[in-house]
């Protein structure tokens, strides 16, 4: 079996082969969905008592009172102080860059006044309270804390509540340190669907939030789907994706490692290279074969590349851009000369990395833009997480007496046409001369 699929856009069956490669349907495991539904209903009904029970069952953490599940801020700062200097400096540098970028996204209230004195506008307000889910256990995701928490605080969210499971009572110090740096307000040692339920419905200990963001396992994803509508959610993310457009002049090892950077996430991750240079594709394939055995996650890489990876020969870079728009990838690298020229042709991508030195990994951690990106072709209609996800817009309408004379007649005419007499009368009552 080949290490990675090879496709040629000139082949008659190319479109079918590409569609099969891209096909991904999130597994709607009925047992997981039903388990999540049961946990949510129980947390909604029994509150803290259910939280304590599920935390003991799933995380083997037994406490007598739900208030003991809250992690004191002093512990976060102790975790921050205990980090190796280089790690702390890296976290703080990344946080500063993420904050600087997202401050440019902050929306502002605006108004304008018409000639008759009528004022119209839009008022921007932040959400009152947001919940942030951070996976726990052996894996540490401090970057997720930064990418989710900092935009919320830049948006002006007064209260940001983090939940993170602590299996066997073991807390992840780098996650707590990131919470201290990012401006999280409260943190609780809870996880799974029960944590989502606590954030959505509230308990005596955990306050209900307006929106839940952050990644999680299948149970967390199922729970987020079910509470959507009661609260807002960010998205239900699919497997990680990278698409690279290359002119054949970037070192092959660089491109191979860029493909690895997403393929190593899990077996369903997707890594694709588009290039008009057949010899370069062969170089990249050779680099993959040479570098892969030395990778710690080689087993995952092999499955991911064999099942969902591809090296695709295209006619030219214009065609590569057209294919990229059809794929609408989460991450798109344009590793070419004059990358701005090709970026102008891209309409659908979560994040675009321009030039040979802009590796996707830099965006994951510290470039500044958010790493929470649309997957599974949803970049056709959705955007990266940002400050705007934590702000709301309210329309402002202040009609002057003079304005009411004009607008009232228009509104009444339209309302009567729709058979809504009270609407019409409401407008007509304000007319000086009906």
From Swiss-Prot:
Reaction(s) catalysed (UniProt annotation): L-histidinol + 2 NAD(+) + H2O = L-histidine + 2 NADH + 3 H(+)
BP terms from Gene Ontology: L-histidine biosynthetic process
Cofactor field: Zn(2+)
UniProt binding sites for substrate: 240, 262, 265, 331, 364, 418, 423
Residues annotated as binding NAD(+): 133, 194, 217
Family per similarity comment: Belongs to the histidinol dehydrogenase family.
Active site (catalytic residues): 330-331
Keywords: Amino-acid biosynthesis, Histidine biosynthesis, Metal-binding, NAD, Oxidoreductase, Zinc
Gene3D superfamilies with a match to the protein in the record: 1.20.5.1300, Nitrogenase molybdenum iron protein domain
Function field: Catalyzes the sequential NAD-dependent oxidations of L-histidinol to L-histidinaldehyde and then to L-histidine.
Protein's UniProt name: Histidinol dehydrogenase
Disulfide partners: none
Residues the entry annotates as binding Zn(2+): 262, 265, 364, 423
């Amino acid at each position: 079996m080949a290490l990675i699929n090879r496709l040629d856009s000139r082949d008659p069956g190319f479109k079918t082969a590409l569609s099969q490669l891209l096909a991904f349907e999130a597994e709607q495991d009925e047992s997981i969905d039903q388990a999540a539904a049961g946990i949510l209903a129980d947390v909604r009904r029994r509150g803290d008592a259910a939280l304590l029970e599920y935390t003991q069952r799933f995380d083997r953490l037994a406490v007598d009172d739900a208030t003991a599940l809250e992690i004191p801020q002093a512990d976060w700062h102790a975790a921050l102080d205990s980090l190796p200097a280089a790690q702390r400096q890296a976290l703080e540098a990344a946080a500063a860059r993420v904050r600087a970028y997202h401050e440019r996204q902050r929306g502002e209230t605006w108004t304008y006044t018409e000639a008759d004195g009528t004022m119209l506008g839009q008022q921007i307000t932040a959400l009152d309270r947001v919940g942030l889910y951070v996976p726990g256990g052996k894996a540490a995701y401090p970057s997720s804390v930064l990418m989710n928490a900092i935009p919320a605080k830049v948006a002006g969210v007064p209260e940001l509540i983090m939940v993170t499971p602590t299996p066997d009572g073991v807390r992840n110090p780098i996650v707590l340190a990131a919470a201290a740096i990012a401006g999280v307000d409260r943190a609780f040692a809870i996880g799974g669907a029960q944590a989502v339920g606590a954030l959505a419905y509230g308990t005596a200990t955990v306050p209900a939030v307006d929106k839940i963001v952050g990644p999680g396992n299948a149970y967390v994803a199922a729970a987020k789907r079910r509470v959507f509508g009661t609260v807002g959610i960010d998205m239900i993310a699919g497997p990680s994706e990278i698409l690279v457009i290359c002119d054949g002049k970037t070192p092959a090892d660089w491109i191979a490692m860029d493909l690895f950077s997403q393929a190593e996430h899990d077996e369903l991750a997707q890594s694709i290279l588009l290039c008009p240079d057949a010899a370069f594709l062969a170089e990249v394939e050779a680099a993959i074969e040479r570098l892969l055995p030395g990778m710690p996650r080689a087993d995952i890489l092999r499955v991911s590349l064999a099942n969902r990876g591809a090296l695709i020969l295209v006619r030219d870079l214009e065609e590569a851009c057209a294919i990229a728009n059809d794929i609408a990838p989460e991450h798109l690298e344009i590793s070419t000369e004059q990358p701005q020229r090709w970026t102008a042709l891209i309409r659908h991508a979560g994040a675009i990395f321009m030039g040979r030195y802009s590796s996707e990994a830099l965006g994951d951690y510290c470039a500044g833009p958010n790493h929470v990106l649309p997957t599974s072709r949803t970049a056709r209609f959705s955007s990266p997480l940002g400050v705007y996800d934590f702000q709301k817009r309210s329309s402002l309408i202040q009609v002057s007496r003079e304005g009411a004379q004009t607008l009232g007649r228009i509104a009444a005419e339209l309302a009567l046409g729709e058979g809504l007499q009270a609407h019409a009368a409401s407008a007509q009552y304000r007319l000086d001369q009906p």
